[in-house]
């Protein structure tokens, strides 16, 4: 097995909507063939790992659900570490509910330890009102992610999980704890899940604010792809920079990954004394 591995965003990196991005199929299958460990990371809490893996398989990539790590799973793992008999009131759908159930988090309507917010299309004002009062009365607010919006299948945009969380923050005066990208908890747990050291980890994504920021904060080698939401001219607007920039996964292969890893320092230089 390789001594390095990858964390890979999906939308804008391997596909756009239901269309595979050129080069992605060949790159992902090469990782599988060469037994290079990798996980797909997503801030989509609606869909289960099986749902996501099935979509990717239909695009010709030989992956399984074990290659998928969602913000819903990150959230469920965090809650499970908080002790026994943890309870949650949930604003969310199938993927989030499944992850919580698999980690023995009891879903309740009264006196929860946490209010957990994920994406959803079935919110009602009454549900938001109930969540507001539960938080005011002591439940802790947890966000599966803070993405402000989400793309729709017809090319439009709808409010994302972060928009709902902001509403609850404003209504209650409480701040949410975010467990999606770029949360270090999610991105560190994903790395550990496939047995990688930080210095041997690539993060590939198309979004500066989540994929690249989160990876840089943990010392990963960050590769920005320009096949999604970021243009080359956008990069100068940020105080931080990716380690590598490519147009798409068509510009990346195993040989290039090994060259990049060979050039990456495996320790940070000592800081000058003040």
Predicted regions and their residues:
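Asp-based, Mg2+/Mn2+-dependent phosphohydrolase catalytic module
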Residues: 1-10, 15-34, 45-69, 76, ...
């Amino acid at each position: 097995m390789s001594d390095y591995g990858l964390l890979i965003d999906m939308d804008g990196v391997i596909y756009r909507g239901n269309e595979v991005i050129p080069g992605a199929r060949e790159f992902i299958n090469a990782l599988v063939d060469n037994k290079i460990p990798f996980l797909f990371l997503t801030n989509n809490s609606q869909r289960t790992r099986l749902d996501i893996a099935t979509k990717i398989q239909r695009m010709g990539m030989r992956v399984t659900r074990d290659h998928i790590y969602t913000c819903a799973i990150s959230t469920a793992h965090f809650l499970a570490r908080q002790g026994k008999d943890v309870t949650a009131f949930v604003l969310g759908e199938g993927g989030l509910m499944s992850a919580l159930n698999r980690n023995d988090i009891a879903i309740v309507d009264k006196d929860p330890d946490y209010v957990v917010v994920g994406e959803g299309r079935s919110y009602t004002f009454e549900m938001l009102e109930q969540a507001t009062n539960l938080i005011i009365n002591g439940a802790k607010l947890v966000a599966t992610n803070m993405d402000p919006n989400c793309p729709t299948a017809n090319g439009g945009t709808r409010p994302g999980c972060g928009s709902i969380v902001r509403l609850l923050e404003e209504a209650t005066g409480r701040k949410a704890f975010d467990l999606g990208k770029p949360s270090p908890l999610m991105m560190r747990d994903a790395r550990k899940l496939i047995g990688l050291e930080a210095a041997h980890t690539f993060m590939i994504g198309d979004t500066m604010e989540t994929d690249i920021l989160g990876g840089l904060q943990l010392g990963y080698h960050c590769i920005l792809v320009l096949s999604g939401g970021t243009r080359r001219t956008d990069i100068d607007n940020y105080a931080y920079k990716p380690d590598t920039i490519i147009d798409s996964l068509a510009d990346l292969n195993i040989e290039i990954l090994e060259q990049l890893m060979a050039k990456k320092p495996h320790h940070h230089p000592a800081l000058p004394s003040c």
